[in-house]
Amino acid sequence: MRGDLTFGQSDFNSVDALILSQIVYNNMEGLVPKEFNQKITLAELAERFISTEDFEERCNMGAMINPLTPELLRLAAKSRRFSNVKVCAFINKIDEKALEQFCALTYQIEKDRYVIAFRGTDDTIVGWYEDFNLGYMPEIPAQKDTREYIAGAMAALKGHFILTGHSKGGNLSVFGGMSVPKKSLARLDAVYNFDGPGFFAPVYERPEYKQIKDRIFAFFPEFCVVGMMFEHVNQYKIVKCSADGILQHDPFSWNLMGPEFEAAQGFDEASKIFYSSFNAWANTMTDEERKKFIDSFFSVIYASGAKTNYEIDQNKIICGGKMLAKLAELSEDERKAFKKAIKVFIKVVKDEIPMFTVFKPLVITHH
């Protein structure tokens, strides 16, 4: 991947799309104009970011996001390829009551070409809660935000659009593509999904999906967990990674060959098992049962008093104790359902996601 080539010399590619998806994980609060018609360059953004009084705090990416993410912003901003890219319309909403975590940024890569990047699940528990709500809600709050954001962008900016996102951001990118009205579809060039969760099968039968499916470019790591949640049908590429297990969800571990990703032969056995067990488990429940389960599951997580995975990780014993006490208050059926779900996840997440690993002793069977 060469940072010295402009988009005129080497066209926008999937690696660019992933870089812009990752940059949006940075805390840009108060640094980027909120409007579509006011823009600053990526170089200016990096300068502002580095000069903030709370720079160190902004660089704490929590337990789930690679700590090199601020460095990626700095290096991209220094490169010939990205330094003159303009940014605008940064929005970051976290609403505990509405169970909503939504963040997006628009990049202007050339005169009439824009890339909208959607942030994936961050370190917040509310972000994970909303992810799970994909399991029964026809539309989660972040998807509604996505539709409104894209409509605003297309009304305010002339030209063509590319949508991109990693993790839940990939799901939002595909959802966003489906939300583009027919009259504006000619302005939608591509939709990128990097290891984002899918949808329930009926979504893929909708005309809104069918009319954009050829513009969707999906990429998943060999050991895929997040992307294995719910169904996937479109063509996708599997990427070779330098990390092991669930850590392959982190794009910094994805191998490159020039301007492309290095292809892997297929999915790892463990993630195939997760795909079949997670989706079999999800498909045996009605929407009502799924909602009930998810609410009781997160009532246990929230009992920890933590707002982020990082906080659980830093206070494992205290948080774990509170969560186990809450679990004991659930009915026997709820406890059984809880353990069954945790079992499905623990197999694949091992020690990497604090809100699950606290429960490891519950599900590890001693022979």
Predicted features by range, described:
Residues 164-169, 173:
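Gly/Ala-rich beta-loop-alpha elbow adjacent to hydrolase catalytic centers
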